Amino acid sequence: MASESLNRPLRVADFIATRTSDDDRGPAVFMHPDDARSRLLTDGELAWVYGPRRHELATVHIEPGIRPGDVTVRDITGIAPSEIVRVVKPDLDSRGRRPPTSYA
């Protein structure tokens, strides 16, 4: 229950679709500093963005101008404005689904 209060769902306020000719492109999530802090995320870090149809890794960008509880996503397939998403820091410390280090 404590983890649920730290990772509240976020509303997609805006969606940015880029073109191949754009310099700045690729999966990204823009969020308010308070929302990032509660998820232990920093600017430039990768995070999982879980949408209603799929999930994808995206670069986190911290933007003070975005309303708390809202996010703007860029180039994340399967997410549309007004949908609810969760942004989760990857768990790199647990051993789940990693290939074995020795085969002996």
Q: Where are the regions that the model predicts?
A:
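Long, contiguous, secondary-structure-rich segments that constitute the structural scaffold
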Residues: M1-A104
